[in-house]
Swiss-Prot record:
Keywords: Hydrolase, Metal-binding, Metalloprotease, Protease, Zinc. One of its GO terms (biological process) is proteolysis. One of its GO terms (molecular function) is zinc ion binding. This is Probable metalloendopeptidase G1-type. InterPro entries: Metalloenz_LuxS/M16 (IPR011249), Peptidase_M44 (IPR005072). It comes from Fowlpox virus (strain NVSL). Belongs to the peptidase M44 family.
Amino acid sequence: MIQLNNGIRIFVNHSMKKDIYIGISDFGFEKDINDGILGIAHLLEHILISFDNKYFNANASTSRTYMSFWCVALQKRHYEDAIRTAISWFFDKKYILKTDFSRIVLENYITELENEYYYRTEMYHCMDVLAYLYGGDLYNGGRITMLERLPEIRNMLSNRMKFLSGKNIVIFVKRLTNNILTLLTNTFGSIPKYPIIIPLDPQIQDARRKIIMMPCPFYTLLIQVDNTMNNLLAIICLVENYNLIDYETISDKLYVCISFANEDQYEYLLYNIKDMDFNINRIELDLGEDYIMNLYINFPWLKNDIFEYIHTMNTKSAMLLADLKKNMHNSILEHKFMIIYPSFTKLLYNITDKQNHGILVVGDVSFTPEKDPSMHHSNKENNNNYSKTVTKRKSKYVMYRKTPTTNNIVIDYTDSSFFDYATFYHVMKSKYEKTNLFSRLKTSTGMCYKHCFDNDDLNELINSDTFIRYNSSKPAVLYQYILLAYFVTERDIKELVDYKDAIELDMKYYSKNKILFGKNTRYDIRTKSMFVCGLIKGRKLSEKVITDYMWKLKSLGLIYYLTSIKLGISNTFYIFAFTIFPEKVYNFFVGLKEITNRCLIVSNKNTKIEEDDYSSLNKQIVIGIK
């Protein structure tokens, strides 16, 4: 580790996939709460990051407490250019920190934020309970209503850059040369050690004794513990050895977060935490650079190299976990915990945020642990007579232990469980992206999922009642597969919709088919979502060209993400994009010279009835399969 004079820490990681990774603590959207406009942090992230996708790949993220950015060159010879690109996001050509946003066209960025909101709510249920209970909203990424306050927002963006301080910045680089160290010193090293403008922290009180009913795939227990080094090390021990365990932070609060498929599992842990046996294998901190970076920026008091603590975690894990269990037990006795219950009834809510998202929050719930964990326990909710019997279970059935080696499961597109695994992957990606619990690799006939779940545990989770209901609550995930199957098979739309669990998507098999484009190039349907999808064909089309289309559409504020699948048929791609501007996205593709043939479907929301209307899709006039 190298520490610059202003407190910035630089780590060299030769095995890192990224070329440069920048983390900024105390810079997330919780700072928006006192500013009065939620989404400033996320908007700033979108404005700052800019790169040429012909030479680089890059991304950024904003959470409650931090912001992070990374960049990697597509070719090794452009490594130093990747470093310069990342630096250019924060500094001008004279190496002066960017604080002037007067010439930025904010409208496109804000509409892109609205499209991201739409994408995330269509693909997942994006609700941040902690942020809401501590003064924010259930969604804090910014909405299109920000267009009404542009002058204020420009000033807030400028002030937000002045929140930056050296002591809160961590930088990972793959290789460190004299030139790169000089670059980093002349740019990031010029940031003050302490911020020019000291931000006000939100007034946060402990959220106690609450049950939150909201759309989620599993039961989740959040127990507040002391924000200390020993507790952090104990949590890392658990994360390396168990699935569906992580931590959550907001301001200086730390929560242990554990998810379960069944209600009696969380109840057992709630009443028996002191007796839980955690088996910890060797700790190697093999969690990837994302997780390691998040440790530094979620816990800015962590000043030493986290790898210095591997010996402590391996030799003193029993002591660390005993102290953590005691802390969790005391927090339960003091009611410093929350329970998230899966609920998918839109009409069942008693609280709405400023954006009219509704959830059911039951406060002052009474939990009284008894000495005998096998005894009956009564939980009385607010104004309700409600009791549950806690079943004493063996601890091995409560926690989902990681397997020592990575498991692979290949699911054919034609398999009836394909959509279950596809949705499970999306859930893991959205909730546990940094821990890399569940990754995928496309094959010619299906998906290969890599995971560290025991097969019985994985089956229990995917076939649990809560996950099945969650899966059914997000029809938007299925639209792209239903319409893909419509284009590449001989089956009509009604058959596909009625039997969506048996959709055949074997691209290798259907590459033998020849698709004939009809005279009409546009078909309008009405569903529960807004999107544009269909087939495009052209000799000059490639995955790289379509990626360029995505970035152009994003820069115009028209979409957040564009999915594309290359078909076996020559020069033909299937595309799909959720958007709040379906007409504009359709017109964008119509105007592209590289596309010589197209058949696009434009979906608008069906406001009259709940049923989807595919009546315009007559197989004989849309396309021909030979």
